[in-house]
């Protein structure tokens, strides 16, 4: 599901695009880098973990892509400025900047150390603002360019037990909308927001877990490659909003119609889910340092949590539809 006008920005350069990707060391970032490398793209890959970045770069180079690795913590504005300078020197021009960094801390808000919540907001909101500040200045000089922000369904509907993550995603959406409005007089500069459902990437396992329970993620989890393909398509057809997964659109509508009923339902759903989940160690994950566990594109959760893609999609859509029915009934009663 996509919205916004179609343009021709980037079509002449998109054959062999020049792209910057932050958060490129695993998951969606790695999948996007590999997809672009297969098209012969010239890439600048950034993340905190040098070893994981180099592994991704090697895969991309085997596809014939030219790749520059720039270890970067996007929470540091000076580091992102340095990344932009190196990217310009290596690429010459930037067709697309993919702002993809994302971390999370799962647990009841009062149980999550406030330092962890701070770090989540700094990475997921301020980090994306640092990316945008660097990218937009390049695009204004070029008079064209595409900024892609990876947001998530959390930008439309808050996720209980992930309060800081939800705050950062709502903030990202507001920031993108404001930035897009400021750039309205520049028809060849685009700010594109991507909102996927839960993605089966290593990010979930890498994140901070203060619940004492194993976090698997609810089905139907998305293949990171599906999200990557949506990002790559933005080179040819930039759009303001890209929603991936049928549940996201349904949740967006239900939240708009009956936000209180929706929030209560989400709280009960995740509360019961965590109560039944196997026990696991409390750990800060990648919030304060790069992941220690291996990266890669996949998280391995789809094989554990889903029997078939079709069956789980039907189940998830059915659950959302049931929640929608309850929410609409509650909304109608409140209007009487």
Regions from the PLM with identified roles:
Residues 25-26:
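Conserved glycine-rich cofactor-binding loop
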């Amino acid at each position: 599901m996509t919205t916004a006008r179609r343009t021709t920005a980037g079509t002449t350069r998109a054959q062999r695009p020049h792209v910057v990707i932050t958060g490129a060391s695993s998951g969606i970032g790695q999948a996007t880098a590999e997809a672009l490398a297969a098209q012969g793209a010239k890439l600048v890959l950034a993340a905190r973990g040098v070893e994981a970045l180099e592994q991704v770069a090697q895969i991309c180079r085997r596809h014939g892509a030219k790749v520059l690795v720039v270890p970067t913590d996007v929470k540091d504005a000076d580091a992102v400025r340095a990344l932009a300078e190196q990217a310009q020197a290596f690429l010459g021009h930037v067709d697309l900047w993919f702002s993809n960094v994302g971390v999370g801390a799962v647990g009841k808000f009062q149980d999550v150390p406030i330092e962890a919540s701070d770090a989540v907001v700094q990475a997921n909101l301020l980090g994306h603002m640092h990316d945008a500040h660097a990218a937009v200045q390049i695009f204004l000089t070029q008079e064209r360019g595409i900024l892609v922000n990876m947001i998530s369904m959390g930008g439309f509907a808050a996720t209980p037990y992930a309060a800081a993550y939800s705050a950062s995603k709502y903030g990202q959406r507001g920031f993108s909308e404001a930035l897009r409005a400021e750039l309205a007089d520049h028809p060849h500069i685009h700010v594109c927001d991507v909102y996927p459902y839960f993605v089966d990437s290593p990010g979930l396992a890498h994140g901070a877990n203060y619940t004492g329970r194993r976090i698997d993620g609810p089905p139907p989890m998305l293949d990171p490659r599906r999200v990557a393909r949506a990002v790559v398509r933005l080179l040819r057809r930039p759009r303001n909003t890209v929603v991936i997964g049928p549940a996201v659109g349904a949740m967006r509508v239900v939240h708009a119609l009956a936000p209180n009923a929706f929030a209560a339902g989400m709280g009960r759903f995740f509360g019961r889910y965590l109560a039944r989940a196997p026990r696991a160690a409390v750990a800060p994950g990648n919030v304060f340092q790069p992941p220690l566990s291996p990266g890669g594109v996949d998280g391995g959760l789809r094989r554990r949590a889903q029997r078939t893609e079709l069956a789980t999609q039907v189940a998830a859509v059915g659950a959302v539809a049931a929640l929608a029915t309850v929410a609409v009934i509650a909304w109608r009663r409140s209007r009487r």
